[in-house]
Amino acid sequence: AGLRAEEFEKEVASHDNISEKEREELIKKGKFAPSYMWNVNGWLCSKLGLHVVSQTQKSVPQIAEHDIYSSTLDMTIPKGHCTGMSAVVTTKTKEGITIQSECIGKVYDENEFDCNDWTIMGEPNTRVVIERPSTVELTCATVINRIVEVLCAEPGYTTTDQMPENIYKAFN
Protein backbone atom coordinates (compact mmCIF):
# COMPACT_ATOMS: atom_id res chain seq x y z
CA ALA A 1 0.00 0.00 0.00
CA GLY A 2 1.15 3.52 -0.71
CA LEU A 3 2.94 2.85 -4.02
CA ARG A 4 2.28 5.11 -6.98
CA ALA A 5 0.67 3.24 -9.91
CA GLU A 6 3.90 3.21 -11.94
CA GLU A 7 5.81 1.84 -8.92
CA PHE A 8 3.19 -0.90 -8.54
CA GLU A 9 3.54 -1.84 -12.22
CA LYS A 10 7.33 -2.06 -11.91
CA GLU A 11 7.61 -3.71 -8.48
CA VAL A 12 4.52 -5.98 -8.40
CA ALA A 13 2.53 -6.39 -11.62
CA SER A 14 5.52 -6.81 -13.94
CA HIS A 15 6.21 -10.21 -12.36
CA ASP A 16 3.00 -11.50 -13.98
CA ASN A 17 3.86 -10.18 -17.45
CA ILE A 18 5.94 -13.19 -18.51
CA SER A 19 5.47 -16.00 -20.99
CA GLU A 20 4.04 -19.37 -19.97
CA LYS A 21 7.47 -20.93 -20.59
CA GLU A 22 9.17 -18.38 -18.28
CA ARG A 23 6.52 -19.03 -15.62
CA GLU A 24 7.04 -22.81 -15.86
CA GLU A 25 10.81 -22.33 -15.43
CA LEU A 26 10.27 -20.17 -12.33
CA ILE A 27 7.89 -22.77 -10.89
CA LYS A 28 10.43 -25.55 -11.48
CA LYS A 29 13.11 -23.48 -9.73
CA GLY A 30 10.77 -22.66 -6.83
CA LYS A 31 11.04 -18.94 -7.61
CA PHE A 32 7.53 -18.22 -8.84
CA ALA A 33 5.54 -15.97 -6.50
CA PRO A 34 1.91 -16.97 -6.99
CA SER A 35 -1.00 -15.19 -5.41
CA TYR A 36 -2.90 -17.33 -2.92
CA MET A 37 -5.69 -17.73 -5.45
CA TRP A 38 -3.28 -19.68 -7.71
CA ASN A 39 -3.53 -22.74 -5.48
CA VAL A 40 -7.29 -22.34 -5.02
CA ASN A 41 -7.95 -22.71 -8.74
CA GLY A 42 -5.81 -25.84 -8.94
CA TRP A 43 -7.56 -27.26 -5.87
CA LEU A 44 -11.01 -26.61 -7.36
CA CYS A 45 -9.99 -28.27 -10.63
CA SER A 46 -8.67 -31.30 -8.77
CA LYS A 47 -11.83 -31.66 -6.67
CA LEU A 48 -14.03 -31.30 -9.77
CA GLY A 49 -11.99 -33.83 -11.77
CA LEU A 50 -10.88 -31.18 -14.28
CA HIS A 51 -7.51 -31.19 -16.04
CA VAL A 52 -5.64 -27.86 -16.12
CA VAL A 53 -4.17 -26.89 -19.49
CA SER A 54 -3.13 -23.33 -18.63
CA GLN A 55 -3.16 -20.92 -15.73
CA THR A 56 -2.26 -17.23 -15.58
CA GLN A 57 -2.39 -14.53 -12.96
CA LYS A 58 -2.58 -10.78 -13.10
CA SER A 59 -1.96 -8.26 -10.33
CA VAL A 60 -4.23 -5.23 -10.60
CA PRO A 61 -3.58 -2.14 -8.46
CA GLN A 62 -6.38 -0.80 -6.28
CA ILE A 63 -6.15 2.99 -6.45
CA ALA A 64 -7.25 5.40 -3.71
CA GLU A 65 -9.97 7.76 -4.91
CA HIS A 66 -9.16 10.06 -1.99
CA ASP A 67 -6.65 10.15 0.87
CA ILE A 68 -7.14 7.13 3.16
CA TYR A 69 -5.64 6.82 6.62
CA SER A 70 -4.57 3.34 7.72
CA SER A 71 -4.23 2.87 11.47
CA THR A 72 -2.57 -0.52 10.84
CA LEU A 73 0.14 1.04 8.67
CA ASP A 74 0.06 4.32 10.63
CA MET A 75 0.11 6.28 7.40
CA THR A 76 -2.10 8.18 5.02
CA ILE A 77 -2.27 6.77 1.51
CA PRO A 78 -2.58 9.71 -0.88
CA LYS A 79 -5.27 9.91 -3.55
CA GLY A 80 -4.01 8.18 -6.70
CA HIS A 81 -1.68 5.81 -4.83
CA CYS A 82 -2.22 2.09 -4.41
CA THR A 83 -4.23 0.86 -1.43
CA GLY A 84 -3.40 -2.74 -2.31
CA MET A 85 -4.04 -5.11 -5.17
CA SER A 86 -6.38 -7.55 -6.79
CA ALA A 87 -4.95 -10.94 -7.78
CA VAL A 88 -6.86 -12.42 -10.72
CA VAL A 89 -6.11 -16.04 -11.61
CA THR A 90 -7.57 -17.61 -14.75
CA THR A 91 -7.42 -21.38 -15.22
CA LYS A 92 -8.44 -23.12 -18.45
CA THR A 93 -9.19 -26.83 -18.46
CA LYS A 94 -9.12 -29.64 -21.01
CA GLU A 95 -12.88 -29.98 -20.48
CA GLY A 96 -13.49 -26.41 -21.72
CA ILE A 97 -14.32 -25.00 -18.29
CA THR A 98 -12.63 -21.78 -17.21
CA ILE A 99 -12.23 -20.89 -13.54
CA GLN A 100 -11.44 -17.28 -12.76
CA SER A 101 -10.88 -16.19 -9.18
CA GLU A 102 -10.04 -12.81 -7.74
CA CYS A 103 -8.94 -11.82 -4.29
CA ILE A 104 -8.59 -8.19 -3.30
CA GLY A 105 -6.28 -7.24 -0.46
CA LYS A 106 -6.18 -3.56 0.30
CA VAL A 107 -6.63 -0.81 2.84
CA TYR A 108 -10.34 -0.08 3.03
CA ASP A 109 -11.81 3.37 3.14
CA GLU A 110 -14.49 4.09 5.72
CA ASN A 111 -17.33 2.78 3.51
CA GLU A 112 -15.73 -0.53 2.47
CA PHE A 113 -15.74 -3.96 4.08
CA ASP A 114 -14.80 -7.60 3.43
CA CYS A 115 -17.10 -9.39 1.00
CA ASN A 116 -17.09 -12.89 -0.48
CA ASP A 117 -18.81 -12.83 -3.86
CA TRP A 118 -18.96 -16.11 -5.80
CA THR A 119 -20.60 -16.46 -9.20
CA ILE A 120 -20.93 -19.84 -10.90
CA MET A 121 -22.01 -19.48 -14.52
CA GLY A 122 -23.82 -22.51 -15.82
CA GLU A 123 -27.28 -23.98 -15.60
CA PRO A 124 -28.54 -22.32 -13.54
CA ASN A 125 -26.25 -19.35 -12.93
CA THR A 126 -25.67 -19.08 -9.19
CA ARG A 127 -24.36 -16.24 -7.06
CA VAL A 128 -23.51 -16.28 -3.36
CA VAL A 129 -22.60 -13.05 -1.55
CA ILE A 130 -21.41 -12.90 2.05
CA GLU A 131 -20.92 -9.36 3.32
CA ARG A 132 -18.68 -8.81 6.32
CA PRO A 133 -17.63 -12.45 6.80
CA SER A 134 -15.70 -13.22 9.97
CA THR A 135 -12.48 -13.46 7.95
CA VAL A 136 -10.05 -13.86 10.84
CA GLU A 137 -12.19 -16.45 12.61
CA LEU A 138 -12.86 -18.40 9.39
CA THR A 139 -9.15 -18.49 8.56
CA CYS A 140 -8.24 -19.66 12.06
CA ALA A 141 -11.02 -22.28 12.09
CA THR A 142 -9.83 -23.65 8.76
CA VAL A 143 -6.32 -24.10 10.12
CA ILE A 144 -7.46 -25.59 13.44
CA ASN A 145 -9.88 -28.00 11.75
CA ARG A 146 -7.01 -29.28 9.57
CA ILE A 147 -4.80 -30.37 12.50
CA VAL A 148 -6.19 -33.92 12.58
CA GLU A 149 -5.63 -34.40 8.82
CA VAL A 150 -2.10 -33.01 9.07
CA LEU A 151 -1.24 -35.37 11.92
CA CYS A 152 -2.72 -38.35 10.05
CA ALA A 153 -1.26 -37.49 6.64
CA GLU A 154 1.21 -39.73 4.87
CA PRO A 155 4.85 -38.68 5.32
CA GLY A 156 6.08 -36.11 2.82
CA TYR A 157 4.35 -33.29 1.02
CA THR A 158 0.59 -33.61 0.66
CA THR A 159 -1.53 -30.99 -1.05
CA THR A 160 -4.87 -30.16 0.57
CA ASP A 161 -6.82 -31.41 -2.44
CA GLN A 162 -5.63 -34.90 -1.45
CA MET A 163 -6.99 -34.53 2.11
CA PRO A 164 -10.55 -35.28 3.22
CA GLU A 165 -13.10 -32.48 3.02
CA ASN A 166 -12.41 -29.88 5.71
CA ILE A 167 -15.39 -30.01 8.08
CA TYR A 168 -16.22 -28.59 11.48
CA LYS A 169 -15.26 -31.01 14.20
CA ALA A 170 -17.25 -31.04 17.42
CA PHE A 171 -15.38 -32.55 20.33
CA ASN A 172 -17.11 -33.64 23.53
Predicted regions and their residues:
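Active-site-lining helix/loop region of Rossmann-like oxidoreductase modules
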Residues: 1-106, 110-114, 133, 140
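C-terminal helical cap and adjacent loop that interface with cofactors, partners, or active-site loops
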Residues: 107-172
